[in-house]
Amino acid sequence: MDSVSLSEVTVIKGTTHLGFMHSFRQPFCGVKISPKFYLSKVDGPKAISSSSNTKSQFVYGGGSIAATSDSGYKMNGVNLKSRTLMSSAVKERSLLDAYDDEYGGVIVDHGKLPSNPYAFASMLRASLSDWRRKGKKGVWLKLPVEQSELVPIAIKEGFEYHHAEKGYVMLTYWIPEEEPSMLPANASHQVGVGGFVLNQHKEVLVVQEKYCAPSITGLWKLPTGFINESEEIFSGAVREVKEETGVDTEFSEVIAFRHAHNVAFEKSDLFFICMLRPLSDKIIIDALEIKAAKWMPLAEFVEQPMIRGDKMFKRVIEICEARLSHRYCGLSPHRLVSTFDGKPSSLYYNVVDDDHDPSHSNCSTEFYR
């Protein structure tokens, strides 16, 4: 008998589809099939069957296989004594590895996903049935970019996009059909910072961006940027100023923040304006991002037509001047630990006067030391 390439055969248990690229001199040597398998006609290794019957006959690229009365198998009319139709090196798993979350749902272990798309499809369906039977709620499925071919399979099973990062896409599935989904939505905001760096000569550190909208070409503006993941607002402001201008600074306080909507890809934006004390004055620009940077007299800065006509920025300047003359007090970070999660976090607030600990009061602190 001619050898049979297992790349021509699709075997399904539940809805598992296995395609192999190896040929054997003896047909299906070292391979077995369970009577629980139900089989389908295929048109190559990528064929997928959605059949749910339990017929014991299937067709491969060069012929057909049928169950015999003695629980053996027959191919093209020839009895196969071997009852093996799956490589012993490939041990089938029926469910995806997952662990429970705090809210009655499950999180799939993305480090243990099967590499075979057919196996993934079968295990995903079986897992959904198992989780539904156990009364689970939401399912979180993180698919690394290296296994992006699994994304359309999950989408076909009813998963939805939640968010994506550089190395993965996160999908979700809400199991209870009679209940609205309680899974939290993707992050709705981006967080930016601007560094208002003022020296003792009342000069403000400003930059001209290398790439900007034509309407603001030539505008001198504050160094700005986005907060990185797990980065504090105050450290992000110091970092952005250093990266763009080379000037070292010390965080003083958040003097104001702006909340705007539909800023980028329909996301909202939180922009924190931070007053920073300069610790150096030498400017070394980031040539990839910044066209120019300099120390500019505050009076000259606010007289720029675009700045002068901007009511919001005019108010920011007024707040900064009020802070310098002790008529205003911004928000300073205080590290505290909450019993809810046991983790330290930054709570921003101001203290006008603390008789027990004068150093605790940020409002009485001179901006220039």
UniProtKB/Swiss-Prot annotation:
Record-linked InterPro entries: NUDIX_hydrolase-like_dom_sf (IPR015797), Nudix_hydrolase6-like (IPR003293), NUDIX_hydrolase_CS (IPR020084), NUDIX_hydrolase_dom (IPR000086), Pre-Nudix (IPR040618)
Stretches assigned to the Nudix hydrolase domain: 188-318
Keywords: Hydrolase, Magnesium, Manganese, Metal-binding
Ranges annotated as spanning the membrane: none
Entry GO CC: cytosol
SUPFAM superfamilies (alphabetical): Nudix (SSF55811)
Expression tissues: Expressed in roots, stems and, at lower level, leaves.
Phenotype upon gene inactivation: Small and stunted plant phenotype when grown on 12/12 hour photoperiod light. No visible phenotype when grown under short or long day light (8/16 hours or 16/8 hours of light/dark).
One Pfam family per UniProt: NUDIX
UniProt induction comment: Circadian regulation with a peak after 8 hours of light. Induced by abscisic acid (ABA). Down-regulated by salicylic acid (SA).
Motif (Nudix box): 225-246
EC numbers for this chain: 3.6.1.-
GO MF annotations, alphabetized: hydrolase activity; metal ion binding
Residues holding Mg(2+): E240, E244
Disulphide-bonded residues: none
Known cofactor(s): Mg(2+); Mn(2+)
A biological process term (GO) from this entry: response to wounding
Presence of keyword Magnesium: yes
Function: Probably mediates the hydrolysis of some nucleoside diphosphate derivatives. May be involved in plant immunity and act as a positive regulator of defense response through salicylic acid (SA) signaling.
Family designation: Belongs to the Nudix hydrolase family.
UniProt cross-references to PANTHER family, sorted A to Z: FI03680P, NUDIX HYDROLASE RELATED
Protein name: Nudix hydrolase 8
Naturally occurring in which organism (per UniProt): Arabidopsis thaliana (Mouse-ear cress)
Gene for this chain: NUDT8
